[in-house]
Amino acid sequence: KIPQCGMAEFSGVPAYPPVLDAMLAVIIRDARKIGQKKRLRSLKDLDKSALALASACSYLLKEETPDESIRAEVFSYIPRQKLAEIITLVREIARPSDDNFHEEMVEQYGRVRRFLPHLLNTVKFSSAPAGVTTLNACDYLSREFSSRRQFFDDAPTEIISRSWKRLVINKEKHITRRGYTLCFLSKLQDSLRRRDVYVTGSNRWGDPRARLLQGADWQANRIKVYRSLGHPTDPQEAIKSLGHQLDSRYRQVAARLCENEAVELDVSGPKPRLTISPLASLDEPDSLKRLSKMISDLLPPVDLTELLLEINAHTGFADEFFHASEASARVDDLPVSISAVLMAEACNIGLEPLIRSNVPALTRHRLNWTKANYLRAETITSANARLVDFQATLPLAQIWGGGEVASADGMRFVTPVRTINAGPNRKYFGNNRGITWYNFVSDQYSGFHGIVIPGTLRDSIFVLEGLLEQETGLNPTEIMTDTAGASELVFGLFWLLGYQFSPRLADAGASVFWRMDHDADYGVLNDIARGQSDPRKIVLQWDEMIRTAGSLKLGKVQVSVLVRSLLKSERPSGLTQAIIEVGRINKTLYLLNYIDDEDYRRRILTQLNRGESRHAVARAICHGQKGEIRKRYTDGQEDQLGTLGLVTNAVVLWNTIYMQAALDHLRAQGETLNDEDIARLSPLCHGHINMLGHYSFTLAELVTKGHLRPLKEASEAENVA
């Protein structure tokens, strides 16, 4: 089903692009299913025809048959008419290599026929140079689509790719209405994602290039931006520095490779590659097991409700929640109401289990009022920053890390409601749709940022956002991700912004290693250093690269929006090519460090494990409604998962405080504690925390005497509804 209920649901123009994107995603998915079913049904005919053709062609290979007799011999095996029928059948059934089930997409024309006029007549599209052809087609359809014409022979044809041509232009050379419409929508979807076509006046779907530093603003800030990013104004100086780093690192790694037992050079395949042995799990010494057990035994049991109130007593995070329209509005016991609302959202249980009619701070009216007026992205972010900053002051957290290192990973949530802010992925969501909560965790175990992503979009689009948009006191400069977050463009952007990108690549040894000096001799690494970078691209775009990086650093443009616009599906711009070029060099520096330094690989793995373990705590907290997110709109999803991050941070902070107290207690008891053991402790435990509430087995005296409970008043019933 299309993930929207009708045009009446839309609150404005910004809703159209995501609806279009979601609709086409469903159409493409269904087209693939239909095409695969068709192929299965025709497989026997295709196999039979292929075998017949193979037999016919085998006569061509018989040396003993004279050339002039081949046709007669073939036709003696398969009559001419039969062979012609087989060839026709194969051409009908077999799919070309560039086929993307477009024929099945055209069959679903009826699903877009009613939607398209609303889109074309309501949204004002504009374009960058790369989107002019799409915009021309859009203007044409906005004029002609209301007509009943079956053929659009005067339509702009530049958008018709080779894979679409046979479905758009029929045998009589007419441009069909159905084929052209679906071809256009496919092109429009791609152009909107890349922002080659954009929505005029929209923040989310507008032109990111227009928001970059430019003109007098750029000239006034140019030198300041160069200095803040730590790059020279002369591109040759930057290239010389990169070349020296890369050359010296190649030589250092090559000199030590024969001593590196974890890495082998494999030349048996078509291309040489490195084989990297997996890291062995770290042994857990008896002293660490004993320390973990002693601390676990000392941690007092606590209800999650009390934990939130206790953390508020330490940090005052509830003070960050202020009334949406009356900043000075405060009521008695507001922290209690806020804690209840936070728990309702984070645990995914709703307000009902927390309502107490005899407690003023927990009445139905108070909790609904608190949720409506105090819970929003702004206040959640500020409250979370208080917890993260408090965690950073604790001695135990400082042993774990200094806050300079972080990891990014996604948690998947099924969304069993109709919403445009969700996407399909059978691996994670089965037959449902879902969202990804892409969150960032510091080496002190605190979560400092989170992004809600429809479905499972490429992580690489969002990985920089957590560093640039987070509002805590931490200053992470290095980030670890899984393979999905890695791309050469991201490596380039990280370097331009002064950050270190350290992903865990699934097959690092098979990656392309790039060199800057074509003639350099890197010994045993010569065979894998087969990529040749082109520094000229960097020189030509150097000032533009710094302008782009400076705009990101100053928050002029959102990272994910810009990355989408840079990732052209066809013919990347000169700027994109230059960033990718510098990314290749920095990716190679990373790869050389990765294969050479086991401690580096271990550090990446350790930080990623922290993020995954933190997800387990968040799952335990978000236990209601099968852990499914049932908010329909983006704001609601972001607020709920932001609340989950806040409550998870409260659990981590509470555990850290009490673990520190337990360590102090053990020292006072004369225990000798090993610093290395303390560094390997984790605050990501939750067995001592009651998140499920308490159950009462007492009855009111009236009921024990056989009387019924009083019925609700009408006003109460309306409030519940």
Model regions: which residues?
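Structured, charged N-terminal subsegments at the starts of enzyme catalytic cores
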Residues: 248-357
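Long, positively charged leader/targeting segments at protein N-termini
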Residues: 338, 373-377, 413
